[in-house]
Amino acid sequence: MAITIKKITLDKEVDVFDITVPETETFFANGIAVHNCNEIYLSTCKDESFVCNLSSINLERWDDLKDTDAIETLVYFLDSVMTEFIDKTEGMAHMDAPRRFAINQRALGVGVLGWHSYLQSKSLAFESMQAKMENIDIFKTLREKCDSATAQLAQIYGEPELLKGYARRNATTIAVAPTTSSSFILGQVSPSIEPLNSNYFVKDLAKGKFTYKNPYLTKLLKSKALDNTETWRDILIHGGSVQHMTALSDEEKAVFKTFGEIPQKEIVIQAAQRQRYIDQGQSLNLMIAPKAKPKEVNELMIFAWESGVKGLYYQRSANPAQELARSIMTCSTCEA
């Protein structure tokens, strides 16, 4: 029996998503380039289009800056950038909506980078109770200092119309953005709030290829007379991992676990801890094993939602060193 379809009629209009933007973190939605950001939670309406000024604090230097006015100064700086944006867009074509939002809300987003590097500098395992305590202390301090700074700005320069009576200059002050490029430039520290993908890898950037060796692991290996080519090649072949090394103690191995070796539920728990202090969101990535069952992934996402995490960013499955290790250990002439 043969059936011939003569005509297809759509009874409603549907959204079309064309995922065709190469080498960018964007996609087309109904002809509009959309950024898949998860740190920004601001509104857009017919008359306003959100804008937000972002910058990140290097947590590797947290002990040096936590008792200074560095955080407050960063809030002052970002607010002045917002003022400059408002001034420069006056009368500019097609900028009425974002300028109006900037005037009414002056939204800022102070974030962080170098979280895993900070823990490793103190020889703290990502999964440890001490890490959880540091996590809470850092973001509680960040919240208090940002609130103090925006209150001072409101007292000096006044409150936007939308915030009249709230004693605030800015609708938001904290947003944890992804910092893959900036963290690498800023001393090759770990990106944002996530663990390092690998202890040893080659990063291919526009300016060239750069080799990354975990500086805190390097220091440890030097103390054991193991900082040599043979050791690092062994680490590379094992996907940037040190979990196989008999020369390291269990405590030392725990400190240098990579992204995929840390239980992802632990990453969600830390995100939930800090979310209470973040008025916007956090760029939260998860490293899911390729063999993970859909049910397990679903349970992890539900756990994140139930824990108070506002959203998730990327779901990854392999790190750069693992990919390179595969190419090293694979005979290309043996492939079919």
Task: Map each language-model feature to its residues.
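Intein-associated homing endonuclease modules of the LAGLIDADG/DOD-type, together
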Residues: A2-N36, I185
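Internal maturation/activation junctions in enzymes
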Residues: I71-R99, I103, A107, K122-T179, ...
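Contiguous, well-ordered alpha-helical segments that form the cores/surfaces of helical PPI scaffolds
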Residues: S56, R106-S121, A171, S181-F184
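Function-dense linear segments that define catalytic or interfacial modules
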Residues: C37-A102, G114-Y118, V189-P215, L220, ...
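Conserved active-site and cofactor/substrate-binding residues in soluble primary-metabolism enzymes
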Residues: S49-C52, D69-Y76, I103-L113, M133, ...
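Catalytic alpha/beta core of large soluble enzyme barrels
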Residues: I86-K88, I174-A325, M329-A336
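Generic recognition of flexible, low-complexity loop/linker segments
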Residues: T4-T9, D15-V16, Y41-L42, F101-N104, ...
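Structured loops at beta-to-helix junctions and adjacent beta-edge loops in soluble globular domains
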Residues: T20-P22, G31-I32, S55-I57, A177, ...
